[in-house]
C-alpha cells in the first residue's frame, strides 16, 4: 500500500488546468494524502493558496509536484525548491512539446514527463532523449459526472452545439513569422510553404511538414538547427490551428445548426452574421 504523501498542485490563469488541479486534489485526499494548491496569481497572504501558506506547508518536504505545461517546474526558484526537497515532479503537457523546448532542457532532477499524444511522446524521445530520460503517454479523458446531478436528455439541453476556445484570425498568428524573418527571405518563404503544405494535408504533423519543406527546398541542416526551426514553428502551429478552427466553425455555421461560441475573440468572427450563430457572453466558472 502506498504511504501517505504530500502533493503540490497549482492554480494559474488557465481554467482547464485549475479544474484538473481541483479534481486531482479531491482524488488525492480521498486516498489519504496531503495536498497544497499554490495560486501562482499571487493572492493576498490570508488566502489559503497564498505563498505564505505554501511556505508553511513546505516546512515539511513535499513528496510530489504535479504541473501542467511546465507551470510550476520551469522557473529557477521552483527548480531549486523541488531539488532541495527531493520531490518527484510530474509534468503533463497538454500542448505540443515544440512549445516547451526550454523546459525540457532545464527542469528539476526528478522530472517525469507525460504527453497526451503518442506523437508528442515520440517527438520528446527523438529530440530530448538525453535531457528527458522519462516520458510516457497519458490518455486525455473526461471525468464522470456527479451521481447527484441528473443526466439531462439531449432534447432538454440548452445548446445544440457549443464550441469553447479562443478565436484568432489565422493571418494574425502568421504575423509572428514576419516578426522573426524578413518578408520574402528564404526562411520566411520556407515557413510560408510549410503552412501551405499543412493546409493541403491536415494529417501532417508540424515536424513532418517542416521536414518535407526542407526536402523541397533542398536544405540540409544539423539536428540543433532543426530543433531551433521546430521551436520557431510554434507560430505555424498556432496559424494552422486557428485556420482549421475557423474552417470547422464556418462549416457548422453554414449548416444551419444552432451554434454557440464561448471564449475570447468571437466578436471579431465574420460568421456572427448568421442568425444561427450565438456568442455566449462572459466567463463561465468551471466550479458551477
Give the ranges of each region predicted by the language model:
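Conserved catalytic or regulatory cores that recognize and/or transform ribose-phosphate-containing ligands
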Residues: 130
Amino acid at each position: 500500500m502506498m504511504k501517505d504523501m504530500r502533493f503540490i498542485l497549482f492554480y494559474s490563469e488557465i481554467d482547464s488546468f485549475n479544474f484538473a488541479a481541483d479534481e486531482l486534489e479531491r482524488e488525492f485526499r480521498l486516498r489519504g494524502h496531503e495536498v497544497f494548491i499554490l495560486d501562482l496569481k499571487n493572492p493576498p497572504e490570508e488566502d489559503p493558496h497564498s505563498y505564505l501558506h505554501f511556505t508553511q506547508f513546505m516546512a515539511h518536504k513535499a513528496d510530489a509536484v504535479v504541473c501542467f505545461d511546465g507551470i510550476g517546474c520551469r522557473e529557477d526558484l521552483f527548480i531549486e525548491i523541488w531539488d532541495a526537497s527531493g520531490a518527484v515532479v510530474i509534468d503533463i503537457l497538454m500542448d505540443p512539446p515544440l512549445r516547451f523546448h526550454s523546459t525540457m532542457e532545464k527542469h528539476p532532477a526528478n522530472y517525469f514527463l507525460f504527453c497526451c499524444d503518442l506523437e508528442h511522446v515520440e517527438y520528446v524521445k527523438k529530440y530530448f532523449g538525453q535531457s528527458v530520460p522519462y516520458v510516457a503517454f497519458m490518455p486525455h479523458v473526461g471525468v464522470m459526472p456527479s451521481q447527484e446531478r441528473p443526466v439531462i436528455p439531449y432534447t432538454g439541453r440548452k445548446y445544440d452545439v457549443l464550441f469553447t476556445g479562443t478565436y484568432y484570425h489565422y493571418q494574425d498568428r502568421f504575423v509572428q513569422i514576419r516578426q522573426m524573418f524578413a518578408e520574402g527571405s528564404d526562411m520566411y518563404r520556407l515557413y510560408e510553404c510549410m503552412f501551405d503544405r499543412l493546409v493541403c494535408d491536415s494529417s501532417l504533423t508540424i515536424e513532418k511538414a517542416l521536414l518535407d519543406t526542407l526536402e523541397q527546398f533542398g536544405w540540409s541542416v544539423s539536428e540543433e538547427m532543426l530543433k531551433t526551426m521546430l521551436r520557431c514553428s510554434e507560430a505555424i502551429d498556432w496559424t494552422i490551428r486557428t485556420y482549421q478552427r475557423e474552417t470547422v466553425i464556418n462549416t457548422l455555421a453554414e449548416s444551419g445548426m444552432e451554434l454557440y461560441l464561448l471564449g475570447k475573440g468571437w466578436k471579431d468572427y465574420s460568421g456572427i452574421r448568421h442568425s444561427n450563430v450565438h456568442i455566449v457572453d462572459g466567463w463561465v466558472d468551471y466550479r458551477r
